[in-house]
Structures are given as structure tokens and as C-alpha cells.
Amino acid sequence: MDEILLQDPEIAKAIALESQRQMGKLELIASENIVSTAVREAQGSVLTNKYAEGYPGKRYYGGCEYVDMVETLAQERAKLLFDAQYVNVQPHSGSQANMAAYLAVLKPGDTILGMDLSHGGHLTHGSPVNFSGRLFKIISYGVQRETGRIDYDDVAAKAREHKPSVIVAGASAYPRAIDFARFRAIADEVGAKLVVDMAHIAGLVAAGLHQSPVPHAHITTTTTHKTLRGPRGGMILSTEDMGKTLNSQIFPGIQGGPLMHVIAAKAVALGEALHPAFKVYQQQVLDNAATLAACLTEAGYDLVSGGTDNHLMLVDLTSRDITGKDAEIALDTAGITVNKNTVPFETRSPFVTSGIRLGTAALTTRGMKQEHMRTVGQFIIAALEKRNDTAELEKIRKNVEEFAHQFPLFAHLA
């Protein structure tokens, strides 16, 4: 920070304030995590200076021998971690990984069967405001009203009726395990390709704590942050026979030069995920999520599907007449960072919502365990109950800050 402080004190100030925010607040946004110092060093390295259009051994620029080493290491580590034949580590984001996957097997106007955004899906699974909904015909499936779980019979019925070219499995706000084998059986029955977006659960999959989609999907996409705990970016996994097509969809299809400094950071994070400590961490993420979910349930809060199988939970605030927006604001005032989220069969706008989404990956990285989750749960409950009392929220914030500062941003669990 010394050079930034001297050269650009305004940016230095913003970075310092963000650092203080991360250390002094409780990060419960399910799509966020905290990377290691090694990952940050790789992303801030001299690799940011290098242009490297193409792929290892087939670049359009000279001087790529060392970035070839970096990208090859990232590919090989991902193949080993997920038992995949083919990996592309160049996507700048999960959304671009999904776009490349679709373009590899679809033509504009083809039909996609994907999870409804308000039921837990992602923008790229067919939202009309996203490229997926603008380029392709979208049929949506969702969860059962009674259980909050994916209605596989409905998925199968819609697949038979609409004969989609692609079925998308995976979600951004679904707290239960997904049966990828069942999705593949449905896809095979109607002659569809199965694309799985495992962005949220990639770390759990890598640790063997969630069914892997890789043996079942024709194409698997993911982000490299979230539970995988790497830099912000994307990745594609598939079989070797899909490799040439997928490579061409990323470059020259939708991207130019890869971000080699980010790919280096991906490689470091993938290396970390190959260590036994990573499985310990992921198990703690699950244990913490289960504890936090139980704490909220015991206090009378409604959780979509009644609980969680993974790192996240969705709190339905409808019965308490609290909007997700108001809950997010109150919790942030109290030093707890969450995001408002639609719930299945939502009646409010996505800018207001009836729920909040909570995740335990970041707090687990800081070294928190089940007993700490009970404390976090009590902070959440107190802040929601006192949401209209500014003075009480300030008292809670001070307690939250004191509690948060007991934990480093990145704790080594083993």
C-alpha cells in the first residue's frame, strides 16, 4: 500500500476503508469469501503486464513461455481436483463461462430449460434481462411450494413437453443438494445436453462433500471464488472431445487476451484446494451453516426448504412482514453484511424482496466454528427485532465489531 498511498491517496483511502469494513463486519453474503495472501500476491504480480491471446503452446504473442507454465499448472490442478478430462481456466467470470458453454452447443433461438431466478436460479439461466434470455427461448422450472425443493417431476414433464436443447442445473440461492444424476437422466431422455453451473458449491464438490456434476454433465461451469476460495473468475470443465469447441467459444469467441495474473491466482487457489486442510475447511463451512440455520429456526424464522445442505440458507421474512431490503439495511447498520433475495413464489419486486440470503464460507475462512455461529445468529436475530431502533442497532454494531476483530481475515484451519 505504500506506493498507492504516495501516488494515489484517494484510491489508497478507499482500499483502507474496505479493509476496515471486511475486518470489522461479519460477511454473510453467500457468494463472497476471503482469499489467502498467496492468492492476492499472485493476482498482484507482474503477470498483469503480459498479453497472451490463445492457449499454452499456441499463442498469438511472443514471450509467453512463463505464462504458459502458469496456465498449464492451473489446468492440471483443476483436472486433478475435479477429475475432469478438459479444463478451460480463461473465463473472466462465471457468466462468461456459461455463455461459452451455451454457444458451444446452441444456436440463437434454441430452447433452454433452466431454474427460475426467483426460485434460486441465476441470471444466466434464462432471465429475460440477461443474454441467455435474449438469445435463447427459455422454459423455467422451480421448486415445490410445499417443500422448497426442486420439483424433479416438473423438470421431467417440461423437458418432455418442450424438448430443450440444453437443460441447466445449478443455482445461486438453493440451499439443498442437487441430484445431478437425475438431471442427466432427464436430459438423456429428451436428447438434451446437460450444463451444470456449480459456481456456489464448487468448493464442496472439490472436497467430496457434494455430489460432483462432472461425471454427469456434458459441460460443467463454475466461478473460482465463492466456496472454492479463489480470485473472482470462471472456469469450464468437460470431456476431451468438447475441448476444441469450448476453447474456440472463449477465444476468439467471446474474449480476447486472458487475465494471466488472475489465472495465476486461480492456480494458487486450486493448489490450496488440493491440500487436506481444504476438506477440513469445507466440512466446517457445512457445520457452521447447519448451526446458523438451526439457530434461526429455533427463533421462529422460516427458512426456505426448512434448512440447508450446503453453505447457504434463504430466510423467508414474509410472515414477519419485513422486506428483504429493510432487513439488509438493518443488518448492515448492525455490522452484518447480507443480501436481500427473492424467495420462491415471490410477491415483491427483486429490488425489495421478501427474503435474505446468508452464507458461511467467509466467516469460516476467518476461523469461526459452530459456537461462534450461535453468537452470529443471536446478532442477526437482535438486529432484525430492533430494526427500527437506531440506538439499539448501534449497540449491536459495537458488539459485532468487537466480536469480528477476534478473528483474522484468513485463518489457517489445519
UniProtKB/Swiss-Prot annotation:
Keywords: Amino-acid biosynthesis, Cytoplasm, One-carbon metabolism, Pyridoxal phosphate, Transferase. The modification N6-(pyridoxal phosphate)lysine is found at K226. The record marks H225 as: Plays an important role in substrate specificity. Its cofactor is pyridoxal 5'-phosphate. Pathway: One-carbon metabolism; tetrahydrofolate interconversion; Amino-acid biosynthesis; glycine biosynthesis; glycine from L-serine: step 1/1. Its EC number is 2.1.2.1. This is Serine hydroxymethyltransferase. It comes from Desulfovibrio desulfuricans (strain ATCC 27774 / DSM 6949 / MB). The gene is glyA.
